[in-house]
Amino acid sequence: MANHISSEKRIRQTNARRLHNRYYARTARNAVKAFRALTDRTEAEKKYPVLASMLDRLAGKNIIHKNKAANLKSKLARRINTLA
């Protein structure tokens, strides 16, 4: 256990930050799952820019890795092209 006030504060801050980051990572995962479930191309084309922006924001804040965001955006863009 922490012996210094500053280390106790650091633990509190880390836990709060971890919960905050987990919330946004979970939100992004749910958005990606919902996007993959879409079957209408026009609906997917409308939602893609919002989802791509969300992934870019999370990558910029180091909540997800920038390469993971790029890979997800690429796969989702290819998915749009396969929809009829």
UniProtKB/Swiss-Prot annotation:
Give the highest taxon in the source lineage. Bacteria
What are the UniProt keywords, alphabetically?
Ribonucleoprotein, Ribosomal protein, RNA-binding, rRNA-binding
Keyword Protein biosynthesis appears in the UniProt entry: no
List, alphabetically, the SUPFAM superfamilies matched.
Ribosomal protein S20 (SSF46992)
What InterPro entries does the database record attribute to this sequence? Answer: Ribosomal_bS20, Ribosomal_bS20_sf
Per the record's keyword annotation, is Ribonucleoprotein included, yes or no?
Answer: yes
* GO cellular component terms attached to this protein's record: cytosol; small ribosomal subunit
A molecular-function term among this protein's GO annotations: structural constituent of ribosome
Q: Please name the GO terms of the biological process aspect recorded for this protein, alphabetically.
A: translation
Similarity comment: family membership: Belongs to the bacterial ribosomal protein bS20 family.
The protein's role, per its UniProt record = Binds directly to 16S ribosomal RNA.
Q: What is this protein called?
A: Small ribosomal subunit protein bS20
Q: Which organism is it from?
A: Porphyromonas gingivalis (strain ATCC BAA-308 / W83)
